Design a protein with these regions (language model features):
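Charged regulatory segments coupled to nucleotide-binding catalytic modules in large multidomain enzymes
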Residues: 4, 8-10, 43-45, 50-219
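Flexible loop/N-cap segments at domain edges
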Residues: 39
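GHKL-type ATPase core
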Residues: 1-36
C-alpha cells in the first residue's frame, strides 16, 4: 500500500513540477511554493534554457484579434535541445526524465505561463530527426475561446487564423533539429598525400573521434 501511495505521490509531484514550472522557478515574479507531503517542489525546465548547448531561437510575436476585436499577442519561441550525451544527471531530471526527452517533442502551450498541453505537433508529422525540437507558445487568457481551451485548461487547438503563421517558426526549429541530427563532423587530415587508415573527425563540440577510412586503398 505504502509503495503504491509513494508512486502516486511521485507522479503528482512530477506533474505539478512540469505544469507550474515557470511559477516555481520565479519567472517574472517571486517563486511559487508548492508542497507535496512536506516536500517542496522544484520547477522543471523542458527547454533546458540555461544549458550551453541548447539552441535558443528568436522569439516571434504574432498579433491576434480576440472575440471582441481587440489585438492580443501570441509569442512563439523555438528551442533545439542538446544531444543526450551532453546532459548531466541534473539536466535529465530538469528536462522531465530521459524517457520523455525524445518522446515529448513539439509544441508546449502556456496559458498565462501555466502549461496546458505539450509534446504534440497538432497533426504535423513526428520525426525521429526532430526529436530535440520544442516550441514554446504563450497565449493570454483573453484568447481562450479562439484557442478552444476547455474549462479544465487541459486541451487546446491551434486556430486556423494563426496556424500558417506558426509554420515558419516550426519549420525553422525542425530544420535546425534535422541538421543537428545529420551532422557527421568534418574529416581533418594532416597530409592530403597520405592514405590514412583512420579518419580523424572534428565534431561540433570540438571533440575528435576516429573512424575507419573505408575509402583507403588498403580496404
Amino acid at each position: 500500500v505504502y509503495a503504491e501511495l509513494g508512486k502516486h505521490q511521485n507522479a503528482t509531484a512530477d506533474y505539478l513540477s512540469l505544469i507550474f514550472h515557470r511559477y516555481l522557478n520565479g519567472e517574472g515574479r517571486n517563486p511559487l511554493t508548492i508542497m507535496v507531503n512536506n516536500y517542496k517542489l522544484t520547477g522543471l525546465d523542458p527547454f533546458l534554457e540555461n544549458h550551453r548547448k541548447t539552441n535558443v531561437r528568436r522569439k516571434i510575436e504574432i498579433p491576434i484579434k480576440d472575440s471582441e476585436g481587440k489585438e492580443q499577442i501570441v509569442s512563439v519561441q523555438p528551442f533545439v535541445l542538446p544531444f543526450q550525451k551532453d546532459l548531466s544527471a541534473k539536466d535529465k531530471r530538469l528536462s522531465g526524465g530521459i524517457e520523455n526527452y525524445r518522446a515529448k517533442q513539439g509544441f508546449y502551450i502556456y496559458r498565462n505561463k501555466r502549461l496546458i498541453i505539450w509534446g504534440t505537433w497538432f497533426g504535423r508529422h513526428r520525426d525521429e530527426l526532430t526529436k530535440y525540437a520544442r516550441i514554446k507558445v504563450d497565449i493570454p487568457n483573453s484568447l481562450d475561446d479562439i484557442w478552444g481551451i476547455d474549462i479544465k485548461k487541459q486541451h487546446a487547438t491551434i486556430p486556423a487564423i494563426i496556424r500558417n503563421r506558426l509554420t515558419k517558426a516550426v519549420d525553422e526549429a525542425m530544420d535546425l533539429a534535422v541538421k543537428a541530427q545529420t551532422y557527421r563532423g568534418r574529416v581533418e587530415k594532416v597530409d592530403e598525400k597520405v592514405d590514412y587508415i583512420w579518419d580523424r573527425i572534428k565534431e561540433r563540440d570540438n571533440q575528435f573521434v576516429y573512424r575507419i577510412n573505408r575509402n583507403s586503398r588498403i580496404f
